[in-house]
Curated annotation (Swiss-Prot):
GO terms for biological process, alphabetical: arabinose catabolic process
Protein name: Arabinose operon regulatory protein
GO MF annotation terms: DNA-binding transcription factor activity; sequence-specific DNA binding
One cellular component term from this protein's GO annotations in UniProt: cytoplasm
InterPro entries: AraC-bd (IPR003313), Homeodomain-like_sf (IPR009057), HTH-like (IPR037923), HTH_AraC (IPR018060), HTH_AraC-typ_CS (IPR018062), Tscrpt_reg_AraC-type_HTH (IPR020449)
Gene coding for it: araC
Source lineage: Bacteria, Pseudomonadati, Pseudomonadota, Gammaproteobacteria, Enterobacterales
Amino acid sequence: MAETQNDPLLPGYSFNAHLVAGLTPIEANGYLDFFIDRPLGMKGYILNLTIRGEGVINNNGEQFVCRPGDILLFPPGEIHHYGRHPDASEWYHQWVYFRPRAYWQEWLTWPTIFAQTGFFRPDEARQPHFSELFGQIISAGQGEGRYSELLAINLLEQLLLRRMAVINESLHPPMDSRVRDACQYISDHLADSHFDIASVAQHVCLSPSRLSHLFRQQLGISVLSWREDQRISQAKLLLSTTRMPIATVGRNVGFDDQLYFSRVFKKCTGASPSEFRAGCE
């Protein structure tokens, strides 16, 4: 029987956790000076922040050189083929492997450098803050206290939100707090099979018609369409990262009838739930 690998910096580590974080200090000709090669990617996401030196990311013939301050996001299934740039003497990068909470999906849609590999570079003034958050996530994630993992996940959520705040600050006016609260309420009640707009409107102290108008004005989509997108996104996440029965996945996103869930899922994704899950394995 093969020996279990307990070092996440070395090949063979299972990453069978909600969050694993660390620092990979690659020096030329050192014991970590090899290329990570995962052609099928991983089941979770990986965030990667370069802090020293240069790394090179390869993807089907394309290449990207990452430098200090660059943050990359590898989603589930994305090719992982990266290592120290041959012209650099070192590549130090911090990383966080995680399985996201359902309502994070919007925050994980990043501009890409190629394929599905996301990219974000904070401006010079903000880089120290993002670097500090990364360090706090790693410190919490490697802790052994009862709440260490939960603290790390919450710090990661803060990092993702701070990136969203930076992007929105430069591209969009602030979202109406009532629309934001409505989105949060909907995300928190995806399993409610008796959902209606009136309950959301009541929660944010608006009439259903006013909420519908504001929602479409700010997000460019109806309340029901946005909820449907969130349900399908959550279903895809559960299908790809758990062995939960399909009927249970459906109930988790508000479908009491498995056949109806399968029809809606296939209409939205082009594949049945079982076909989608098989494609993720």
